[in-house]
Amino acid sequence: MEKIEGDFSKFWRFDVLPPINRLSWWWWWVLVLVPDPIHPERSRQLMVLWSSKETPAIRVSGHWWIPKARMYVDEEGGSVMSGMVCAWWYDGNKMFEPLLMKECRMASVDDKHPLWPVEAKETGMGAGAVVPLTSEDLSFGLRPGRRSFWLNLTSDQEKVMEGSPKDFSVEMTPWWERPSTAKYKNNVFGLNMGYDIQRVHGMKAKLNIDGEEVEGSAYIQKVGVQAPSLPWFWGMLHFDDGSYLDWFMPHVSPSFTMKDDTPWSMRDFFRTPNAGSGIFHDANRNRTENFKRCTVELERQEGENALRDEQGNLLPRFKIKVWNGRTQVSIHVRATSRARWVFDQPTRAGFVSHLTYNEYPLEIEKIAILDEQGLRSIDDYEWIRGNAEHAWGILN
């Protein structure tokens, strides 16, 4: 596969829907997963986010962000927006979070914009970039001809002093057709509320960490959301043969009333699923399974081998099941660390809405894939790497 397939005509634009005060939220999100030589059952992971929001003010993990201007879109479709570049790095043992949390102005252009380099050629194919206007190179982009994505990042100096790497650069190339073809979803509920999502489920990745190059995989998404955020579970797995699996279970729960980032609240004791789903790009069968049924169970790790986050909280274990009429997948995974983003947004009449968004690097304990051709287990794969999300609260 020589290039990344799919329609990238809107990948570098966020003006698909008219903005809604306090509800519109836009971001590009990249997750890179590479081997951990010390703990081979785990993975080292880098997450980078370029984000903006239509809001008078919002507190992000203790930092008040007050946008200085609204998003500006020129006649050629280029955008300039106030926002933040945020990142975390998990080295297999320690979570550096935030690795970076930097306010900046960002410009995004595609390969049809006059500012796109003339020498790039092959215009109109969806290449483009988001370039934070900072002294460091914090850019993310798709090269001409859609041959590869790139990402550059420089860590916060304080985190470098704590032991994190300073410089990261990533080159992401196609893996195979199904996971490396961009998937697009757009849904408008009414009153301009809805979502606009584009994802590339699986890419090969070469990650350079302070001069050390290591190979792994990457997941990329571009999201625009215009609706209150409710609690959810989400997660994904990359397999050594190029297979990709994910699950998504938004749910109704008393956890939407939670106002801090402390896990294991009594308010999170039951959850009513709301339209769970999943997808499995199965390289072994050369097919894609779409799932409309999904369950996620959450429990604390227990015993002498139980792991804790950087704040001393016991980490979770997830039990996931997705299935359709032909294939059923059951997964047992445990979190090996936790990165959390805590959002507090003033609303009406002095009230403040809250969202805690947790990201968990995973260790895969068991997996069972049952279809008409038989049963597969963790022993059928050289490695499986993944990440899971759990969010509570409601941001509006």
Residue ranges and their predicted role:
Residues 1-396:
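Structured soluble/peripheral alpha/beta segments that form catalytic or ligand/cofactor-binding pockets
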